Amino acid sequence: MSAPKLSFRGSGSQTGAATFAFRGSGRQDTYGRFDLKLDGALNRPRVALLLDSPLPAAGLSAVSVQLDPVKGGFSYVASGGSTLGPFSSDGMILTTPGQDTAVRVDRLLVSDTLATGTIRTTADGLAGRLVVSGGGVNGDVLFRPGSGQQLIRANLKAENARFGGDPPISIRTAVLEADILLIDGQSNIDATLRAQGISRGELIIGRVAANAKLTDGSGTATFTVAGTRGSTFEFQAKADITPDRYRISGNGQFEGRNLRLAQPLELRREGDGWTVPATTINYGSGSAKLSARFGSGNSRLDLTMARMPLSLVDIGYPDLGLGGSVNGTVKLTQSAPGYRSVKRS
């Protein structure tokens, strides 16, 4: 079977009067490669699904989902990897005749953070609530339908939160407030984030404040990033967003020298990936010109530097204490997961 965004091949056989077995694999443009296995009763089979990389933006990988028919519906077990570390989940899909279908999440564990709750599918949409706790994170995610629209509201707070991703992530304090409103096939987003003391591996950011307002994928986002305590780094930026393009302008200071984008940085959707046309970043008397492409398939980054002060690296890695300046080029390509080629001059 083939379609513009889906290819699938499989085979199966009937194993009894009302039982069968089926195996197949394919690729979907958004969710990547997948394997599917069905076996058991024709009307209530066991289902096993493996997704290689269903949501790259969240770092989801090797996602396994298994459904088993039980009294009252299906039990489910899921697991995989993510940017925040490994996750696992189990619960029930309740299909009681005469009642709304419901997903009961008994356990959704990401690193040490747990979410539990029940979400029902009503005539108007999804209704329910997931309660989040543990690992330094507390709050909830609310699902509320009505008047032809679906609201998803997240209120989450973090204090000394840690996630076992690769590399590990830690957050001293953070508050996320987000409303996602789905209306007639379009999505509206109003989100605010305030965070301090964020680290990912050796990268450290002192403070982040951001706000985004999008209507059906278009709108604006503003954010401010500052260095750790004692740092003089601060950068303010604004992004004009459409579904196929992000246009970012911004400027700031570090150690008394101006840091700015000479022209807006653009991210453009092209096919199944994104491109960054040549953009120049000026810092003090130096500059760096970069262009890139990333997404499925081949990815690349081209960077050319002229008299760029090395102290700029101290923004994210404050203990390095580098001095001097750098001239040269860096070309990085990635043609397959886990393989990279780097050229320097």
What is the meaning of each model-derived region?
Residues 1-345:
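Interface amphipathic segments
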